[in-house]
């Protein structure tokens, strides 16, 4: 989802303070403890080449998240069938091999979980990597903090139990934890890792601090060693910047942590007619997309575009077509798809 990072971090509400005080205590979960799982050495994150599939509500919901093209009335079988076609279209149209999906307690702890699993299962069955990320709710709950630990931990217990042994499924404890300070967020991420020691570290995505807008602080925390780090970055965060300024800005958010970092959200308008295959120094978004994709390729970073599919979103790189029961996708901006392919190690550079 698209948010603008604040210059100064907001003050967390009282329950965040209580959480921070409680971090010294052992977290109780229903998942049995095991010896800590160790991550294999990695050289880069280029295997992650994907898109976000989103709820039209930007994934913020106080009820189950419903991905664009799906319905809570769909059975597991129908969800699986629809998702299979959407995933196949992501691969056919974009060459993607990764999809990032939202979850929340309403989705996982309720009746819809049986159907929603069809999305994860369909993607995994086609060889996709699946990043499952927790989103907070709306209104007062949309504050960058875990909404309710009494439902948060049972949610993750259920997800881990279902997918711990599926090596294609990855877990992101929270999307954009901007309500926490850098230290509080690192503490919270460490608590998650301690709660699920049997999950291999290289199956976990630790969000960058703030709006996922920098990974340098989580990268420096030894408690989070072996995990992937997730970065978010958007062109609208600046009114205007040159190509070179964008490159410098993005690299500053990554520091020397590129080998662990996946940009699992980045994006720009795709339905407004911009041509991302030609240099246009006057256009901030053209400068941004070219800088971002060049930088991810240079640093050998994986990237997951936001959004691959979200109904009525001008940033969406795909749009639904055909029979709603047999959905397919069309590309909204081929030049945007070309830049994404370039980030993933294919295609041609922009001639500057």
Descriptions of predicted regions:
Residues 14-16, 35-98, 343:
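N-terminal carbohydrate-binding accessory modules
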Residues 83-138, 149-152, 193-201, 282-299:
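Aromatic-lined substrate-binding rim segments of carbohydrate-active enzymes
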Residues 55-59, 105-107, 138, 177, ...:
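Feature marks short, surface-exposed loop/turn motifs that line or immediately flank catalytic pockets
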Residues 40-42, 86-92, 119-121, 216-219, ...:
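Short amphipathic alpha-helices and their capping/turn segments at secondary-structure boundaries
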Residues 64-80, 150-157, 161-170, 174-302, ...:
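Extracellular glycoside hydrolase catalytic/binding regions
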Residues 145:
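Short acidic-hydrophobic catalytic motif
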Residues 40-42, 125, 352:
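Post-signal peptide N-terminal regions of Sec-secreted extracellular proteins
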């Amino acid at each position: 989802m698209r948010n603008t990072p604040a210059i100064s971090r907001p003050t967390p509400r009282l329950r965040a303070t209580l959480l921070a005080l409680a971090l010294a205590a052992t977290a109780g979960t229903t998942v049995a403890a095991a010896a800590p799982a160790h991550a294999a050495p990695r050289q880069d994150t280029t295997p992650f080449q994907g898109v976000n599939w989103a709820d039209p509500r930007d994934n913020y919901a106080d009820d189950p998240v419903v991905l664009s093209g799906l319905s809570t009335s769909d059975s597991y079988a129908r969800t699986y069938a629809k998702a299979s076609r959407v995933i196949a279209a992501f691969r056919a149209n974009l060459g993607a091999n990764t999809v990032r999906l939202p979850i929340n307690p309403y989705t996982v702890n309720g009746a819809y979980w049986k159907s929603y699993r069809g999305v994860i299962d369909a993607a995994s069955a086609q060889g996709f990597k699946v990043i499952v990320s927790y989103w907070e709710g709306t209104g007062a709950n949309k504050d960058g903090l875990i909404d309710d630990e009494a439902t948060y931990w049972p949610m993750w217990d259920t997800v881990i139990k279902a997918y711990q042994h599926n090596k294609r499924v990855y877990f992101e404890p929270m999307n954009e934890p901007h309500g926490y300070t850098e230290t509080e967020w690192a503490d919270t991420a460490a608590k998650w890792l301690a709660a699920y020691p049997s999950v291999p570290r290289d199956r976990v995505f630790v969000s960058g601090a703030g709006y996922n807008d920098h990974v340098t602080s989580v990268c420096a925390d030894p408690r989070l060693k072996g995990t992937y780090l997730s970065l978010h970055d958007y062109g609208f965060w600046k009114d205007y910047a040159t190509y070179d300024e964008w490159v410098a800005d993005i690299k500053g958010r990554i520091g020397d942590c590129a080998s662990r970092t996946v940009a699992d959200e980045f994006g720009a308008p795709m339905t407004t007619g911009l041509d991302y295959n030609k240099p246009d120094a006057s256009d901030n978004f053209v400068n941004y997309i070219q800088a971002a994709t060049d930088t991810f390729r240079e640093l050998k970073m994986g990237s997951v575009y936001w959004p691959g599919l979200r109904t009525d979103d001008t940033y969406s790189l795909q749009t639904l077509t055909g029979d709603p029961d047999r959905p397919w996708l069309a590309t909204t901006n081929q030049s945007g798809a070309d830049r994404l392919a370039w980030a993933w190690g294919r295609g041609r550079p922009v001639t500057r």
